[in-house]
Amino acid sequence: MPIMGSSVYITVELAIAVLAILGNVLVCWAVWLNSNLQNVTNYFVVSLAAADIAVGVLAIPFAITISTGFCAACHGCLFIACFVLVLTQSSIFSLLAIAIDRYIAIRIPLRYNGLVTGTRAKGIIAICWVLSFAIGLTPMLGWNNCGQPKEGKNHSQGCGEGQVACLFEDVVPMNYMVYFNFFACVLVPLLLMLGVYLRIFLAARRQLKQMESQPLPGERARSTLQKEVHAAKSLAIIVGLFALCWLPLHIINCFTFFCPDCSHAPLWLMYLAIVLSHTNSVVNPFIYAYRIREFRQTFRKIIRSHVLRQQEPFKAAGTSARVLAAHGSDGEQVSLRLNGHPPGVWANGSAPHPERRPNGYALGLVSGGSAQESQGNTGLPDVELLSHELKGVCPEPPGLDDPLAQDGAGVS
């Protein structure tokens, strides 16, 4: 590869690596910080983000290294060449798990919480990663070209005894890449996801038509279903972008394998396809920010607080706080639940005591909608609520607003 072309390739790859790391760390940070985003679907989103972070930290540096054709032991070269296949497979499994999760949520919503639990999701994620390593590192178990070293190329690179010129196609057999990796482990899951999302949209369309035919359709049920469909569209876009980024490289591999007499793809085209495949690790955070309001708002808060160092004023509304009114015989009790703080506990470990106001209102932190009473009133600063602000308050019960951002979150 010419020095100029090599420099451009390395520069672009490094830029992609930085963006992939920063964007996907932001995704994981948002889920960790915002309790509204801590749901089963987003466990799989975090697994997908972890694979994309690993692409930026490891796979892209490995790809840059292997592009130089440096001399190495064959199995060491194999590990470097195959590691990106592990991460690709993990991404595919995460996308498939998300598609199935959304299918269950729309097809059998009443059984969703019983079937799809956090413990099961974490177990599925662990299994997906184990399978990804097994599939991606299969060439190291013997399905490789280490037994047929290309002596001429090795000598031209100045490689010593027992070393090979570390180039992807020289160590990884193309029949593995086409038959096993592409046809079995990439194309089949992509087709399954296509079928699952098609069924999701058909089922949602049928349910919406049934609601329209009812004399008094439930607006809340209709709104929830529409938001499920919106989330499914967002995730289907992510699957489509994955296919768009990875299929060109696999198509080039198919031409190389099925037409050995044809001229090999130009080197610039190969590197363009490789860069496109790595770009997939950058795009997902932008999709979340553009399509999902709760992610977008949390990204803004993280950037303002931790990057720009701007202090945001306290707001007792929106996604960071919720006011719940409980009506009693001796007045009204207003409780404030804050995201990011343990409900009903001060920072020093003591529980708050709701203070009785002269106007008959009490203020306290709640857990699950009930006030927590205890001795002591130190810790978080008091919050003043005026009685006229509470007149006519009639909050909706907490419920699903978006499957990717539950408990009060929303989508745009």
Swiss-Prot record:
Localization in the cell: Cell membrane
Main localization, broad class: membrane
UniProt PTM comment: Ubiquitinated. Deubiquitinated by USP4; leading to stabilization and expression at the cell surface.
Extracellular side: 1-7, 67-77, 144-173, 259-266
UniProt record, GO biological process: adenylate cyclase-activating G protein-coupled receptor signaling pathway; adenylate cyclase-modulating G protein-coupled receptor signaling pathway; apoptotic process; apoptotic signaling pathway; astrocyte activation; blood circulation; blood coagulation; cell-cell signaling
Glycosylation positions in this chain: N154
Record keywords: Cell membrane, Disulfide bond, G-protein coupled receptor, Glycoprotein, Membrane, Receptor, Transducer, Transmembrane, Transmembrane helix, Ubl conjugation
Pfam families assigned: 7tm_1
Disulfide bonds listed in the record: C71-C159, C74-C146, C77-C166, C259-C262
Membrane topology: Multi-pass membrane protein
Residues noted as binding adenosine in the record, renumbered to the chain: E169, N253, S277, H278
Alphabetized GO MF terms: alpha-actinin binding; calmodulin binding; enzyme binding; G protein-coupled adenosine receptor activity; identical protein binding; lipid binding; protein-containing complex binding; type 5 metabotropic glutamate receptor binding
One CC-aspect GO term: presynaptic active zone
Membrane-side (Cytoplasmic) residue stretches: 33-42, 101-120, 199-234, 291-412
Cited InterPro entries: Adeno_A2A_rcpt (IPR001513), Adenosn_rcpt (IPR001634), GPCR_Rhodpsn (IPR000276), GPCR_Rhodpsn_7TM (IPR017452)
Spans annotated as Disordered: 391-412
Keyword Disulfide bond: yes
Transmembrane segments: 8-32, 43-66, 78-100, 121-143, 174-198, 235-258, 267-290
Domain remarks: The cytoplasmic C-terminal domain is necessary for targeting the non-ubiquitinated form of this protein to the cell surface.
Known partners and oligomeric status: Interacts (via cytoplasmic C-terminal domain) with USP4; the interaction is direct. May interact with DRD4. Interacts with NECAB2. Interacts (via cytoplasmic C-terminal domain) with GAS2L2; interaction enhances receptor-mediated adenylyl cyclase activity.
Family under the similarity heading: Belongs to the G-protein coupled receptor 1 family.
Main function: Receptor for adenosine. The activity of this receptor is mediated by G proteins which activate adenylyl cyclase.
Name this protein carries in UniProt: Adenosine receptor A2a
The species this protein was found in: Homo sapiens
Classification of source organism: Eukaryota, Metazoa, Chordata, Craniata, Vertebrata
